[in-house]
Amino acid sequence: LITSSTHAVLDNDYGKSKKQSEDALIKYSDECDAKVYIFRLPNLFGKWCRPNYNSAVSTFCYNIAHDLDVWINDPAIELNLVYIDDVVASIIDCIEDENIIKLKNIDEEVAITTTGASSIQIDKYYYEVTTIYRRTLGNIVDSLKMFRNMRKSLLIPDLSDGFNKALYSTYLTYLEEDDFSYYLDKKEDNRGWLAELVKSEQFGQMFVSKTHPGITRGNHWHHTK
């Protein structure tokens, strides 16, 4: 099993080197009747990836986590992205020969979201990770800046979105230890005090409060909120 690159179809030195590696493995498979798995990965991102190397996402995460400038030439450029955990799940499933969709032809439409499969078998040799995210550079940077501002805004992202969850998990690995704690804005009067913990456009807000003895606060309910 090897992870190749979607650049293998390009007519440049990098693409040619990837294609030659694939061809060598295919030749071995044909000569020895051995099962091989070739994954052509698009842009790979994930936790603890080395910044300022070959992953734009890791560089963005590192820079924004450290309040460094991020420069992008065209925010509208769209990337195809795979998350490292999904790649690992696909590799394990191939080894165990389970959770794999086998296509009859490369143009076949597959209801990936309802199958639960981690991999698609394109042909005898080639496989794809089913979960591929498509996001623009501008969208990625905006999301990361929102994460950085969370300590002030207390607004958390929509973690029901798979990409947001993967990107946030990735971003956290670039924070310094001191960045994991932060002060809350404590509001206090003669009744007691309260402080907001988190807010979300999906579920409202959560806060902690303390009421002094003999004081009644709230004392009402909501039919709908």
Residue ranges and their predicted role:
Residues 96-186:
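Mid/C-terminal beta-alpha module of Rossmann-like enzyme folds, strongest
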Residues 49-59, 77-96, 102, 136-142:
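Substrate-positioning beta->alpha
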Residues 179-223:
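A short glycine-rich, His/Asp/Glu-containing loop-to-beta-strand
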Residues 42, 62-82, 102, 112, ...:
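A conserved pocket-lining segment of Rossmann-fold NAD(P)-dependent short-chain dehydrogenase/reductase
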Residues 6-13, 44-48:
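Conserved catalytic-site region of short-chain dehydrogenase/reductase
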Residues 2-6, 39-41:
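SDR active-site strand-loop-helix element
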Residues 11-42, 55-66:
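Active-site Tyr-X1-5-Lys
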